[in-house]
């Protein structure tokens, strides 16, 4: 969707850039309320995920990541805003009367038809196993485990590429730059996730970010020594270290954050680029 640029009529709209308005009128049988527990805190009330809290109430939309309506054509009826993700969602009316939400593929418009199955056309929005796709196909919503539903490349603008097939596995290049193996029987959706211009958004003011449930970020250099390794000093002091550190004292730049000895280490041919 297009990016709407605000005029500088008030300080809050200066340099503001948001998505063009996509209305949301969700179906009652495809939404449910969710209790957002703690907003970044654990059961003891201690902050475990910083910079979270507040935000507008949300209703969760049930998204069909499995695409298990096999060989039944569906029609895109609406393209809606989803407060729980950056990507837009589509309401699909299937031929058997079923109604479901899916991620909006880039370029899909109201009235387009989609289908999922084993021998379906290589068309944007269609879902099929990797073994039936030609090399070089752009895909999203990729399964890791057969039947569990898509788990990879689901963010706005995300796209992966099928680069090889050998034996029981297919080789994919993911949006992060990682190259890994996945079973050829796993399914994926053809095309790229829509709303590719989401990274061009500029909220313009702090209040707009608070509506999203994101709290202010404070630099460690302006904290006290008890709160951050960069804190302390008289006036504007340097961090006092050779290299930047996290609030818990670990190296902030270049340290690997992936858990060691995971079962999928053997499936990763090239780790993600920094």
From Swiss-Prot:
Single GO molecular function: structural constituent of ribosome
Gene3D superfamilies: 2.30.30.30, Nucleic acid-binding proteins, Ribosomal protein L2, domain 3
GO cellular component labels: chloroplast; mitochondrial large ribosomal subunit
Single GO BP term: mitochondrial translation
Keyword terms: Chloroplast, Plastid, Ribonucleoprotein, Ribosomal protein
Superkingdom of the organism of origin: Eukaryota
Main location class: plastid
TM segment ranges: none
Pfam families: Ribosomal_L2, Ribosomal_L2_C
Keyword Chloroplast recorded: yes
Subcellular location, record wording: Plastid, Chloroplast
PANTHER family, per database record: LARGE RIBOSOMAL SUBUNIT PROTEIN UL2M, RIBOSOMAL PROTEIN L2
Family: Belongs to the universal ribosomal protein uL2 family.
Subunit field text: Part of the 50S ribosomal subunit.
NCBIfam families: rplB_bact
Name of the protein in its database record: Large ribosomal subunit protein uL2cz/uL2cy
Species of the source: Gossypium hirsutum
């Amino acid at each position: 969707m297009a990016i709407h640029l605000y005029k500088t009529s008030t300080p809050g709209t200066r340099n503001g850039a948001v998505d063009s308005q996509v209305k949301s009128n969700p179906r009652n049988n495809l939404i449910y309320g969710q209790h957002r527990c703690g907003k970044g805190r654990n059961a003891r009330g201690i902050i475990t995920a910083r910079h979270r809290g507040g935000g507008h109430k949300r209703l969760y939309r049930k998204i069909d990541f499995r695409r298990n309506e096999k060989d039944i054509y569906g029609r895109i009826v609406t393209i809606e805003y989803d407060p729980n993700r950056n990507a837009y969602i589509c309401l699909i009316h299937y031929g058997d009367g079923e109604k479901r939400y899916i991620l909006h593929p880039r370029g899909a418009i109201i009235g387009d038809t989609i289908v999922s199955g084993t021998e379906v056309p290589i068309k944007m929005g269609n879902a099929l196993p990797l073994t039936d796709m030609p090399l070089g196909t752009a895909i999203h919503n990729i399964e890791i485990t057969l039947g569990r539903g898509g788990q990879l490349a689901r963010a706005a603008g995300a796209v992966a590429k099928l680069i090889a097939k050998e034996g029981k596995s297919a080789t994919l290049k993911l949006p992060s730059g990682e190259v890994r193996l996945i079973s050829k029987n796993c399914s994926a959706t053809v095309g790229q996730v829509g709303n590719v211009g989401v990274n061009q958004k500029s909220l313009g003011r702090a209040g707009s970010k608070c509506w999203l449930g994101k709290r202010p970020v404070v630099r460690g250099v302006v904290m006290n020594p008890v709160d951050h390794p960069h804190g302390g000093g008289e006036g504007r002091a340097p961090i006092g270290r050779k290299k930047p550190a996290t609030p818990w004292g670990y190296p902030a730049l270049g340290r690997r954050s992936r858990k060691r000895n995971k079962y999928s280490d053997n499936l990763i041919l090239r780790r993600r680029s920094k």
